[in-house]
Regions:
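N-terminal Rossmann-like dinucleotide-binding module
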Residues: 1-44, 167
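A contiguous active-site-proximal alpha/beta segment in oxidoreductase catalytic domains
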Residues: 93-150
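Contiguous beta-strand/loop segments that form the cofactor/metal-binding neighborhood of enzyme cores
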Residues: 164-237, 263-277, 312
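Mid-domain beta-loop-alpha active-site segment that forms a flexible
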Residues: 116-123, 146-175, 285-286
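C-terminal helix-rich "cap/oligomerization" subdomain common to oxidoreductases
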Residues: 62-65, 270-313
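Beta-loop-alpha module in the N-terminal Rossmann-like domain of NAD(P)-dependent dehydrogenases
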Residues: 15, 45-103
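Active-site loop of classical SDR/Rossmann-like NAD(P)-dependent oxidoreductases
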Residues: 33, 255-267, 281
Length: 313
């Protein structure tokens, strides 16, 4: 299968390396408007290089898009129009309207459209998934040092959206309320944020994301009747405290031997094309995460604006 990578910045280069090593896949082109990025990719890849994505559409069967978010819609539309299956890095698009249009286009063309919410492929999350039933409280911490990239978007769209997607994948209920706070720290966009999300089922999710820390942490905790699950997504570890009928508590532990969610999501993309089946993370999932992320962003900006206004009195 001939696959091209459009956008060879940090994530694009990672995707290119995984595709290069994947059986049955030919990396048929690397695309980036920045010639410096193409030159950096040249040291590891012999695939043809292009500065315009339209130059590769006639030779590729599928495209991995890892460009700035504001360019996602136009590039994906061109790819789908030409009959290419599309894997899109998160966040899906700049607006829900753009996402809906791409979903409809992919459906009409009978093409795979997958969004890169890679934590769905975390071995710890997959191990826990079968035991998560009717969660009542979820707490997620996604903390990172400043990456000096993805500064075109805020921390909600950059980091928190991963946990938003995980929450939506396990809570099968409508969102009833969103409260959020955040502030810029190292950029002019929100760099630290906390959101409280309430669902009709009674479940509450508290999500914290920061790209202004001295350490890295990615934990996801789920509380439900008779079970408390802790996931360390960086280490691929799951710990569950389980209450038995007699009141006794026992621990269940899982440690992944292999952690490579980027490879796993790309394998799912390629196999969904080959098998003509839906990928684990469809365009619709990307849209739902984007919609909730937008609500959190709006609540954060409203609170931040109110704080600034009150400070002038």
């Amino acid at each position: 299968m001939k696959v091209c990578v459009i956008g060879v910045g940090h994530m694009g280069r990672i995707h290119a390396e995984k595709l290069r090593d994947m059986a049955g896949v030919s990396l048929c082109g690397l695309v980036d408007a920045d010639t410096n990025s193409l030159e950096q990719a040249k040291t590891k890849h012999t695939a043809p290089r292009f500065t315009d994505h339209k130059q590769v559409l006639s030779i590729a069967e599928a495209a991995v898009i890892a460009t700035p978010t504001e360019t996602h819609y136009a590039i994906a539309r061109d790819c789908l129009d030409r009959g290419l299956h599309v894997f899109m890095e998160k966040p899906f698009t700049s607006t829900p309207e753009q996402a809906r249009e791409l979903i409809d286009l992919a459906r009409t063309k009978q093409l795979i459209l997958q969004v890169g919410h890679l934590e769905r492929f975390s071995p710890a999350f997959r191990e826990a998934l079968a035991t998560i039933k009717d969660p009542m409280f979820i707490e997620a911490q996604r903390i990172s040092t400043f990456p000096n990239r993805s500064t075109d978007i805020d921390v909600i769209m950059d980091l928190m959206i991963h946990d938003i997607d995980l929450v939506l994948s396990v809570v099968k209920s409508n969102v009833t309320d969103v409260q959020a706070q955040g502030t810029p720290v190292v950029t002019d966009k929100i760099d630290v944020a906390n959101a409280r999300i309430e669902f009709g089922s009674g479940c509450v999710a508290s999500l914290t994301a920061s790209r202004a820390s001295k350490k890295k942490e990615r934990t996801f905790k789920v509380f439900q009747k008779d079970r408390y699950i802790t996931l360390d997504l960086l280490k691929g570890k799951m710990t569950a405290a389980v209450r038995e009928k007699n009141g006794a508590i026992h621990l269940e532990e899982y440690q992944a031997e292999r952690i490579d969610p980027v490879m796993d999501e790309l394998v799912d993309f390629v196999e969904s094309i080959r098998q003509k089946r839906k990928p684990k993370v469809e365009g619709e999932h990307g849209l739902q995460a984007l919609l909730l992320a937008n609500l959190i962003k709006q609540a954060t900006e409203k609170n931040l604006a109110g704080h600034k206004a009150s400070g002038t009195l």
